[in-house]
A protein has these predicted regions:
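Active-site-proximal alpha-helix that buttresses catalytic centers in soluble enzyme cores
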Residues: 1-126
Length: 126
């Protein structure tokens, strides 16, 4: 079985962390796969905890999906270290990390949608 981790930074604002958990739940419902949220800091579970849950559920392959817009320090330095640590603990599990969100055509569509909403809202206010 392939399991997925939606990996986010984490926030002191719990509603922001809950929003990530909600996205993971929505992904699981739409994709019919097990999707666990995980946080670099300021949220639970961390990556190791999410991996443990997926392995316990029978995952032999884990795909980590960064919920980050761009490839910054956390994705270049911190995430590879955390994945390596989990791979050392779970040697029988295959790990893969996807690219961040930047460059995906759907992101441009989401941003344009927000811009259209703002313009429409401004026109309605006149």
């Amino acid at each position: 079985m392939t399991g997925f981790v939606l990996f986010a930074h984490g926030s002191r604002v719990e509603t922001a962390n809950q929003a990530v958990r909600d996205v993971a739940t929505q992904m699981a419902a739409r994709g019919k796969h097990v999707v666990e949220p995980a946080f670099l800091e300021l949220g639970k579970p961390d990556l190791a905890g999410a991996v443990e849950r997926l392995v316990a559920a029978g995952a032999g392959r884990i795909v980590v999906i960064p919920y980050f817009l761009t490839l910054g320090t956390h994705l270049q330095r911190d995430l590879p270290k955390l994945v390596s640590e989990s791979a050392a603990v779970h040697g029988h599990v295959e790990f893969e990390v996807t690219p961040p969100l930047d460059g995906h055509p759907a992101l441009v569509e989401v941003l344009l949608s927000r811009a259209r909403e703002a313009v429409q809202h401004s026109l309605e206010a006149l």
